[in-house]
């Protein structure tokens, strides 16, 4: 049985918090799921694309600062806060309602290490006061991940926010030839671009400024070590990466 815990219309979207079979979801217009949690283990990441995106923590080992563009239910923010509590996280989200829903229904913690900036995520001005080791790009509207991060000028701004050795990890709904076209745009700006497709309706893009990234050297050991402390199969996620 499906229970509607919250329902509202704002910014032209029909926003709901739905609970069914022990899974709570934040969704818009009855077709886009922004976040999902298992009520028996609310701190676990259960969305395959978000699990894959967390490989960024392996690639950016030792990260001290993480930027999230888009909050949703805050599942990735909460996950990082639990397993990497010393990392400073900055989150941009334009809707105070979404922030409130993340706190009430998805248990987003309040912590000095989590800074939420109420602002349109496509505006990099308020977040440019510092650099970041890792940037998660997960922006979405009623049609899916928005095309903003296909625009070269926007990617250039984000690239300028990265620390040396930093990575950008992005959610994309493209696959096949459409995804390859998007990846070529990224390749214009980044020395290394990897991707994984077939994660439900999502693909994930990984981009680095570093010329020499050897995924077979060092990273498998890091992934195996991290998987002992964190309930994610990082070695499988690493082996799934494809280069363009």
Each language-model region and where it sits:
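A short, flexible beta-alpha/helix-coil linker loop
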Residues: 32-35, 140-143, 168
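The AdoMet/dcAdoMet-binding core of the Class I SAM-like
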Residues: 44-161
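C-terminal substrate-binding/active-site "lid" region of AdoMet-derived donor-dependent transferases
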Residues: 152-214
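SAM/dcSAM-binding transferase cores
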Residues: 1-21, 25, 33-40, 57, ...
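A generic structural signal for alpha->beta connector loops
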Residues: 86-88, 111-113, 165, 190-192, ...
